[in-house]
């Protein structure tokens, strides 16, 4: 299976000027039992994809912190390096610098970009709540992904404990983050590959509408992004598993992810 992701981006989205780079699909050939990369990469001089690791407080709709790991993280880092001039960090074996940390790890504060998967599965402890509060107000950024309508009743209270008094805003497509490099319009609703193969619907749960919620600090800096009714990371993880799914969702998912990463790096 071969397809030019950059070409898909240039056809489906407004992209930066200059020739698009032709790249091929990353196959899902990595060993999903690869040892977990704890801590930060050996060669940290560049962008690092950090994922928040946790032990489930409850069993929500999906399994936990490791959904789509490590393939989504690996693929996203490769594509970020290919589609932009961003330097990425690496492990000594040459792998892109995707890693995971807990809320209490010392390395947390060296992760300007932090992803959390399936946040409805977890309630932060008081110590972790204080830690995440400090992390976000000292320059950190948290992207909570793969959430669907029933999950919000768990996610919102956690965010309100971390950032008391904060307002969760439904970000409009006109927010500059969504066009900082690629013009992402409309904002994508991305199902998991499995759900899409069963139903050919973009929503995994009924007629759910996609939302991208933002939380801002007192200086109007975006500190939390919540992709609601969308599983963006599956479009990264599964890009090599199904041609139709790739063509329907990969360009949208990567365009959004790259925009978010660049926004974090420049704001």
Language model: regions and residue ranges:
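Sterically constrained small-residue positions within well-ordered secondary structures
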Residues: 10-11, 40, 216
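Bacterial N-terminal signal peptides
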Residues: 4-14
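An acidic, glycine-rich "communication" segment
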Residues: 22-33, 57-61, 151-239, 249, ...
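Helical hinge/lid and interdomain linker segments adjacent to catalytic or ligand-binding clefts
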Residues: 69-157, 161-162, 190-199, 227
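Aromatic-Pro/Gly-enriched surface loop or interdomain linker
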Residues: 19-113, 119-120, 231-234, 238-267
């Amino acid at each position: 299976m071969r397809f030019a992701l950059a070409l898909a981006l240039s056809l489906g989205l407004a992209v930066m000027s200059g020739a698009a780079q032709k790249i091929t699909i990353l196959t899902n050939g990595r060993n999903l039992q690869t040892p977990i990369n704890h801590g930060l990469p050996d060669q940290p001089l560049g962008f690092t994809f950090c994922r928040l690791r946790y032990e489930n407080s409850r069993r929500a709709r999906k399994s936990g912190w490791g959904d789509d790991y490590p393939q989504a993280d690996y693929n996203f880092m490769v594509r970020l390096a290919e589609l932009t001039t961003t330097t990425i960090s690496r492990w000594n074996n040459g792998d892109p610098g995707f890693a995971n940390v807990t809320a209490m790890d010392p390395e947390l504060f060296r992760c300007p970009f932090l992803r959390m998967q399936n946040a409805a599965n977890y309630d932060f402890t008081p110590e972790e709540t204080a830690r995440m509060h400090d992390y976000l107000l000292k320059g950190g950024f948290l992207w909570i992904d793969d959430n669907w309508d029933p999950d919000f009743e768990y996610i919102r209270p956690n965010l309100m404990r971390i950032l008391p008094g904060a307002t969760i805003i439904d970000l409009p497509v006109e927010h500059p983050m969504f066009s900082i490099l690629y013009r992402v319009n409309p904002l994508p609703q991305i199902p998991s590959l499995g759900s899409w193969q069963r139903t050919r619907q973009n929503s995994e749960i009924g007629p759910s509408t996609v939302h991208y919620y933002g939380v801002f600090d007192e200086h109007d800096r975006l500190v939390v992004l919540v992709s609601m009714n969308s599983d963006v990371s599956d479009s990264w993880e599964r890009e090599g598993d199904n041609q139709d799914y790739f063509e329907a969702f990969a360009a949208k998912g990567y365009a959004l992810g790259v925009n978010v990463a660049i926004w974090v790096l420049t704001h």
